[in-house]
Amino acid sequence: MSTATTLTVLWVVPVPDFGGVARHVLDVARTGIPGYRLVVCAPEGKLTERLRELNIPVHAVPFGPSRGFRTSFASLTHVIEQEKPAIVHSHLAYADVIAAAAVNSLKMRRLANRSLTVPTLITTEHGIAGDDAVYHGTSWRSKLMEQVHRVRLWGTNAAIAVSRSTAEQMRRKWGARRVSIIYNGVDAPRLRAAVHKHCVPTEPDAPRILSLSRLSPEKGIDVLIEAFAQLHTVYPKAHLEIAGEGDLADTLAQQARELHISDAVTFSGFVDPLEAMGRSDMVVQLSLWENCSYTLLDAKAAGLKTVATNVGGNPEILAPNELVNRRQNAFCDSVLEALMRNCEASAPSAWTWVTNAEMTAQIAELYTQTQKHQGLA
């Protein structure tokens, strides 16, 4: 469709580097939003570099937590005035707050200047947890942010949740209304082919287990190491790859040494996830909370076996026999049972999910319906 007949949507992202949200932005940029011209406002970094490679218009401006409220607000306001988007779509809490402030400031200014155009404001929630400590650490901070989100949602026209669980938490904690569920998409055939390029043949009775996450307490990697140590007594050729970086790297390596499994455990640091999946049979994710995990989506799309905690959006992705209860006393035993079950099982059954094209079509439909509701379409 010609850009002359499309509306501009400005995506606002406060992070410069790769992560779950950057992956989402790139998937949408690569696929396109039907009927809309995508422009991205973000701090300079790897994300903006990749977007330029995709020929996506980018405003790399001083924006994000490190720049502070005043600078971020001024930067975003300038971009909005320059682009005059029909829609401003924010991602992650910092961008949500700044975007709400900027758009609602324009509403106030429009009272004195009716020629000003005020964009529709939409937000996608990627990271709200049932346990407030996961993202906010202290109770006072979580209570403060709860009130901030309640206020900014009053001035937001529509909200997207990446899972049913996410939507439930938004309604329960923030009193959110007009929440639409649009799952993160994954193009399974393309991803499976990409992983297959890195495929390393396995040996009999030599299961290869992969963890792809930050090395931090909420990820439960210590429990995985403990369970793997017991699995290793049954499968002496088993191997565990712990990919990722974080504060617990030394502690987890010491745990592996104390359990006498150092030779069977590799701490590979930051890796290409597709390459890591190519040399693995099973992905394990024991997080305290997940909303719509790209790691699990990719693992399922690649045809790998999976084990994950029964939290957040995980039950919306995985079957019951792939889930373990993190809150029970025998958590490690449950993980071991799931690992053993996967080692003894045949290849996973067929799995289907929302494609990127379906995801972006749903986003476009929400844009159009929200515009109509406001009398703008």
Predicted segments — roles?
Residues 11-71, 181:
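N-terminal strand-loop element at the rim of the active site
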Residues 52-56, 167-186:
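Helix-loop-beta element that forms the nucleotide-linked donor phosphate-binding surface
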Residues 320-330, 337-342:
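Conserved acidic donor-binding segment of nucleotide-sugar-dependent glycosyltransferases
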